[in-house]
From Swiss-Prot:
This is DNA-binding protein. The lineage of its organism: Viruses, Varidnaviria, Bamfordvirae, Preplasmiviricota, Tectiliviricetes. Zn(2+) 1 binds at residues 191, 193, 244, 262. Zn(2+) 2 binds at residues 305, 307, 359, 380. Homomultimerizes on viral ssDNA bound to pTP. Forms a initiation complex with viral polymerase, pTP and hosts NFIA and POU2F1/OCT1. Interacts with host SRCAP. Residues 1-18 have a biased composition (Basic residues). Its main location: host cell. The gene is DBP. It comes from Fowl adenovirus A serotype 1 (strain CELO / Phelps).
């Protein structure tokens, strides 16, 4: 039972006092016990005459006294800094930034982490685009891939701000110095080695009753012929097929690409050049103040799908996203006035193709295409166009700047070829050590 301090009755008012929570807290804290490890409990009496006349100051002063004693006790217990690991400190800084962005987007972040495979990145990217850019429409991309890419670029910015140095490319993209348009020469695709691709005609046979066969007859100038077994098939001939120079003499069996190949292939080299030219001109229209030479020589490419993102291990097959030129829809509706007044419309009209990045090893179409692929190879539904890849970059940096009030580089690296990017026929699984001391038990 608490004792009433002496001379406390002299300060009581004759009016009835309303017992608020603040007053009750003062009465309970008349006697403060401070217990520290290794010390005995000490009781300190505080006279009302020694206190400030403001009850708020009295409560604040008592709280500060308790906090100071607890900090002194903790300093005696652990003389070393609790966050001596820079990785842990960086992860906590990154998590604080994630929490700030989630609160700005009215998004629940409890239980999330800053791991690259956490779903919080995709949620932040998708929520921001849906709230701030509801009018935005994708071009050949899937919403899952686009939202994930916005989250990847956002993760790259947050990792950079927190001082983290991941062993992978957090943005899942590279800046590629392509070299497709040399001066005074006819433009022609170059593979990821930086060498001119080789024209190698290819013929594909499809089942007439399959979806791929029907699409080939309707859209790709396929013809029905009899194969060497006497069966009717839809034949697609690609006379302008371009392959990596390593695949020039490769027969396609038992693997679709030769050892050391980058696995880049275009069924129509002219369409690939048109798509690359379009993406360059469109990027220059989006960034009118950018360095013209750098915008001409370099492009932003998606290199990691869901199969090999946030991993330093090789996968079976192709090691970066497959690039395919797609024909743009609606370019016939672009008028001459629009072409003369808008550089982006001029790019669409002049080169009506864009590059689309799909899974590193997409599932083969039924009917014989890619029959050298194994059914056990890892695959995903990644699909992202070059235009939407650029918009993902823009939205990610825009979101970070709007919430944090400052900009931060994404550190998108420049692509440089090395043998780790070559097509892999077999991948050795890493060893997971076993604790047992007897391998024959």
């Amino acid at each position: 039972m608490e004792r009433t301090p002496k001379r406390a009755h002299g300060f009581r008012s004759t009016k009835p006092v309303k017992r608020t929570a603040e007053v009750m807290m003062e009465e309970e804290e008349e006697e403060v016990e401070v217990v520290a490890p290794g010390r005995g409990a000490t009781r300190k009496k505080v006279s009302r005459r020694e206190e400030s006349p403001s009850p708020v100051r009295r409560v604040t002063r008592r709280r500060e006294t308790v906090v100071d004693d607890e900090e002194n006790a903790s300093d005696e217990e652990s003389p070393e800094a609790p966050l001596s690991d820079p990785v842990v400190y960086g992860a906590q800084r990154a998590m604080a930034t994630v929490a700030s962005i989630c609160e700005a987007l009215d998004l629940q972040w409890q239980g999330a982490s800053v791991r690259p495979d956490d779903s919080i990145w995709t949620k932040m990217g998708g929520t921001y685009v849906r709230k701030k850019h509801p009018e935005f429409r994708l071009t050949f991309s899937s919403y899952d891939s686009f939202n994930a890419q916005v989250g990847r670029f956002l993760a790259a910015v947050i990792y950079s701000r927190a001082g983290l140095e991941p062993k992978f490319v957090p943005g899942g993209a590279h800046v590629w110095r392509h070299g497709w348009f040399p001066a005074l020469q006819e433009p022609f695709p170059k593979c990821m080695h930086g060498v001119d691709m080789v024209t190698k005609p290819r013929t594909v046979e499809l089942n007439p009753s399959s979806e791929a066969g029907k699409r080939a007859l309707a859209e790709q100038n396929g013809v029905i012929e009899k194969n060497r077994f006497g069966r009717q098939v839809v034949v697609l001939r690609f006379d302008a097929n371009a392959v990596c120079y390593k695949d020039q003499e490769h027969s396609g069996f038992p693997h679709p690409h030769a050892h050391g190949s980058c696995a880049m292939v275009f069924s129509d080299a002219a369409k690939a050049v048109s798509a690359m030219r379009h993406d360059i001109d469109w990027t220059k229209a989006l960034y009118p103040n950018a360095d013209k030479r750098r915008a001409e020589e370099c492009v932003l490419i998606s290199t990691n799908c869901n199969c090999n993102y946030a991993s330093d291990r090789a996968i079976s097959g192709r090691q970066f996203c497959k690039m395919t030129p797609y024909k743009l829809n609606g370019t016939d509706d672009i008028t001459r006035d629009m072409v003369e007044s808008r550089p982006d419309m001029k790019a669409h009209k002049k080169n009506p193709h864009t590059m689309v990045f799909t899974c590193c090893n997409p599932q083969a179409a039924s009917g014989g295409a890619g029959r050298g692929l194994k059914k056990t190879e890892k695959t995903c539904a990644w699909r992202l166009s070059a235009m939407d890849l650029r918009y993902a970059y823009v939205f990610a940096t825009e979101l970070f700047t709007a919430v944090m009030g400052s900009s931060e580089p994404t550190h998108v690296p420049e692509f440089r070829w090395n043998e780790s990017y070559a097509f892999k026929t077999e991948v050795l699984a890493p060893v997971s050590p076993i604790a047992s001391d007897d391998p024959f038990a």
